[in-house]
Amino acid sequence: MMAVEEEEVKEVLQKLQELVDQLYSFRECYFETHSVDDAGRKQQDVREEMEKTLQQMEEVVGSVQGNAQVLMLTGKALNVTPDYSPKAEELLSKAVKLEPKLVEAWNQLGEVYWKKGDVAAAHTCFSGALTHCKNKVSLQNLSMVLRQLRTDSGDEHSRHVMDSVRQAKLAVQMDILDGRSWYILGNAYLSLYFNTGQNPKISQQALSAYAQAEKVDRTASSNPDLHLNRATLHKYEENYGEALEGFSRAAALDPAWPEPWQREQQLLDFLTRLTSFLESKGKVKTKKLQSMLGNLRPAHLGPCGDGRYQSASGQKVTLERKPLNALQPGVNSGAVVLGKVVFSLTTEEKVPFTFGLVDSDGPCYAVMVYNMVQSWGVLIGDSVAIPEPNLRLHRIQHKGKDYSFSSVRVETPLLLVVNGKPQGSSSQAAATVASRPQCE
């Protein structure tokens, strides 16, 4: 008799598992059966599919009602939407009490707490699941949660970010063909990039992880968060064309999410205003501009003009003053430029602080300064010297708009000399990255 009952339970669980797998497949592969034009309907369609699945599950369950696996699968079905479900929390909490070693129930419960905004409880669930069994889902989720845990100090947050990268790498090692693991590793590297002074090697690792996610998992390309996060990195690296493309794609994939569209518009607005200011040299009148340029003095070079400049290699070097129009793309070692500020431009995101620099009758160059405190800035008429300037040439085309301009990237205001004076350490601050608190 027991054997027959066990067989029945097994059959019921198998059927329930199939129904839940189909529901999640519907969500993950939505854009394989729908066009991007249907993106606005996706959440509603998933919700309707969930209701349908729960109804079918109810018909199958029968007398197996209180079984831990049944509770887990029902909770998982309720957890398919991005919203917090109190019912899912209740069922999954019961499931882990009945069967504390049921790892999938712990993982699902952790996701429920995450959606509820209880990051500490989510962390406990994923860590607890790993004590029962090493599995990629707990590692993925732990990586995600570690970056959002509240901390009392910057050092503690840095440790969490490093740990987040470690957990994501472990998840990738467990299954190199899991796109979600690669995507979460990309996000961990993105946080590390902003947490450790924007090392270009780390941004490359983030971009490689995102590319790998798309390569191994066809559904990764329809993940709006992947496109937004990658675009954030591209924008910071001044790859504006790729950034606009990413924001635009994220907006198309999730029309109800305002951030990608806003970020695309903000960047377009910034580029439009910047190129207009560059063309008009900040609308400074010719006579005024000539007077400003006539006031440029070698003394304004400060430590960049007397052989005391310490290069990145740590050696003291004598810099050669060059006109802006003689700069080559990339870092111009051994050179220094000196010019007058003709405009400044801040964005809603405050980073970078952008200003226009002119040193002759030639064109105006944009200077983009990163990692500065919000109170730092330069004024129109200030003399600014930039040692070993890093020149970028921009050619951007997006939705019928064209932008072309030259810019100098400055990683910290500490590199600048303003009116002959080096900038103090109080002018520098670290950049941060914000992401929406939802399951990755």
Swiss-Prot record:
Keyword annotations for this protein, in alphabetical order, are:
Cytoplasm, Cytoplasmic vesicle, DNA damage, DNA repair, Mitochondrion, Nucleus, Phosphoprotein, Repeat, TPR repeat
**Which residues are modified to Phosphoserine?**
S203, S221
* Coiled-coil region list: none
Looking up Gene3D superfamilies in the UniProt record yields: 2.40.50.550, Tetratricopeptide repeat domain
**TPR-type repeats, residues:** 7-61, 68-98, 103-130, 136-174, 179-216, 224-253
Q: Name one GO cellular component term.
A: mitochondrial matrix
- Which Pfam families is this protein grouped with? TTC5_OB
Q: How does it assemble?
A: Interacts with JMY and p300/EP300; the interaction occurs in the nucleus and augments the association between JMY and p300/EP300 in response to DNA damage. Interacts with PRMT5; the interaction is DNA damage-dependent and promotes PRMT5 interaction with p53/TP53 and subsequent methylation. Forms a complex with HSF1 and p300/EP300; these interactions augment chromatin-bound HSF1 and p300/EP300 histone acetyltransferase activity, resulting in enhanced heat-shock-responsive transcription.
**Name of the protein in its database record:** Tetratricopeptide repeat protein 5
